[in-house]
Amino acid sequence: MKKTWLRILTAALCLSLLCGCGAPAPSDTAGTAAPEEGYASAFTRLRFPEGAQPSLWALTDGGLYAASREKLADGEVPEGKTLDYEGQYDVMGWRLYHIGEDGAAAPLAYEPLPAPEDTEGRRGFSAEVGVEGLQSAPDGGLLVLESQTERWYTGEAANPERDPDYWDHVEYRSKYFLRTLEADGTERSCGTLALDGLEPYLYEITADAEGNLYLPAEGMLGVFAPDGSALACIALGDGWIYSLARLRDGRVALLLWQNGMRLFTVDAEQGELQELLALDSFPDRLYNGGGEFDLYRTEGTRLLGLRLEDGSEETVLDYLDCDLSPQELSLLAPVGDGSFCGVCSLEDGDVQRVALSRQPRTASERTELTLGTLSATTVGDAVLRFNRSQDRVRIRVRDYSDYVNGEDYEAGLTKLVTEILAGDMPDLLALDGLPYAQLAARGLLEDLDPWLDRDAELKREDLFANVLRSMEVGGRLYEVTPGFSIITMMGPSELVGDTPGWTYEEYEAAWAQMPEGSTPLGPGVNRDMILELCTYLNLERFVDWSSGKCDFEDPAFLQMLSFCAQFPDADSTYYDEGSSDMTRIAEGRQMLVFTSIYSMDDVVYNDQLFPGGSTYIGLPVDEGAGNILYPTSGFAMSAKCADKEGAWAFLRTFLTEEYQTKYSGYEVGLPLNRSAFRSALDKAMEIEYEKDAEGHYLLDANGERIPTSKGGMGVSTDGESVMEFQLWAMTQAQADKLLAVVENATRSVDRNGSVAAIVREGAAAYFAGQKSAEETAHLIQSRVNLYVNEQR
């Protein structure tokens, strides 16, 4: 599948996918034959001595090498000191290893440079040597970038360790050395880098075929010969280097943001960059070229090969099909015949070498299920874990974001929905962005209630039943999710009450108590935002996808329109540079704030907005609580899935306590599983206490330990001053408040948003004073009714 780097991929993926991990065929026609070859992956666990912590890697003609910072000897605990943590005074240093074919790591005859000594009588002096980079050198050797860093204390405190401003009084000095080593680790040469004031950034370095080192710095790129002499110092202007890699011809290429993403090569002799291509896409990372391609790069879950001659690129493989995640890779390099060698760090801590080689396409021994998604990167980790744990079923991802182009950002969604309606539906769906309710109403999705009821380990009482009910369509569950967040409005309890939920009348009564000149919400909130959320909140009342019946002429909709009309339109909203929500609330000029609860920490932070006590009151509704549930990530099964047992094995993992506890945070949000939710609450309620420099707990005047913040953040309130928010341990009252909000939320968001868009369009005339509420409701009723029944 080819394209130029001057446009985003528009060629469609072939619907027949490889059984290995190769690229789809370049066709937009269902049933086109897949390539005869794919990629197969073979993993070898790397075995290092106990305590080794490999972090840098290089592949040379002599094989795979690693650099590890590790314990070299036991340290002596200073007299009168106690350990803050095990190994605090261990002697640490660097070792280099060669990795054998069997994965065994053997140490090299390598000695780091000695740490510098203090010859100036500096207080609190310490020094260390670090390995900052590892690259292949000509003739199978190694290039090692080493640093010597000195640190000393310049403050006046008699005991520097007790100086509360210790880090403000510490100065540093660093030197860098480029060492060329033989394959056995013995030194071939060593040169001091002639930095001349250049402050290097060590996040990304590389070397060319002649052993010259390329080192980014602020606004600069330094090029250094093996003896350390500076060959070039190239100004980048406002550019920022995202990635460096060696081209197939031995030169170095860099990915640079400079009024757009651009690919350059470096002319060290002339001291300038030469532009190769201007890119519309945003590559994640560059890898050294070799074999068929001048350069490789990762985009999403695919490895692409670039040919500079015509600017074309080709999908080489899909990482997920190789049981790999690009985020796990520390190294990937071509090794001839189209093969690759890589190093990946797995979630369980194992480090593995992976060999990717072309193999004849053969039938898989496992049942293969397809999962359709609008973004493979959002589902990749879950699919990868499942595939690695299974020997009967394997999931293959169809990523429809590959159809998106610069002119049509909905092309992927259009393609997927078109295929579904044509009968070519994936076995599983990631539901973000999809018309979930419509698909369920058409009978295209599997009813998951029987599967949940038959599950020997999962029980409904283990989950928040109200959250499950909020995801139902026509009284049936078609979706699973590991967790959810809550979109809500928050206000002072003394004004809005202490129980979630209020009616429009109760809202008006509270608003009447605010002083003149106040606003209900912040100056950036407009009526379109409010209308959209209110539509999501009440959609189940106004639209029945199962029957196709709509009722926007319900008096509740007229009341909703009237409520939304009080907010400014989008053109009238503004950013109040002189005051934030926090400032306006503190001054009594703003009644409510929009917020979300995605984690336990959010509850602790949110409460600090209203020191007198707060309530997650939600949007006003005529009954219940107006807090909106938002599934973190939803998955569904096709009603015609090829292996429903296998599909359920995948879906059920998201509901387990183990999954929701282990992957709490970004992947989960607030856990749907009650036990996982309870565990997260318990962790949030753990109190941390102050310690002194020796690790002893500090006590207050009553002999009690002193609680301390677990962290914090600063938020600018007026463009200059900053309000500090501290992350304290959650209190029982806060835990009870969160649980009440969760258990009282009954409505979830429609992630497709099509109906909300129709409502927004139809309401514009009402907000402009051109139509009455009744006329507007009648118009919206007609349009939504037509849309809903077209979709059924």
Language-model-detected regions and their locations in the chain:
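Conserved N-terminal structural module of periplasmic/extracytoplasmic solute-binding proteins
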Residues: 22-87, 97-99, 103, 148, ...
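Surface-exposed loop and turn segments in beta-propeller and other repeat-based domains
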Residues: 104-127, 188-198, 319-324, 403-404
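Hinge/lid segment of periplasmic solute-binding proteins
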Residues: 434-488, 505-506, 613-620
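Short, solvent-exposed loop/beta-turn-alpha elements that line the ligand-binding surface or hinge
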Residues: 449-462, 540-561, 618-628, 769
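Extracytoplasmic/periplasmic solute-binding protein
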Residues: 476-487, 506-565, 579, 587-592
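Glycine-centered hinge/linker elements that transmit conformational signals in sensory
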Residues: 547-579, 601-608, 614-620
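Extracytoplasmic/periplasmic substrate-recognition and gating elements
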Residues: 607-691, 705, 744
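Long, aromatic- and glycine/proline-rich binding clefts that accommodate carbohydrate-like moieties
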Residues: 666-761, 765
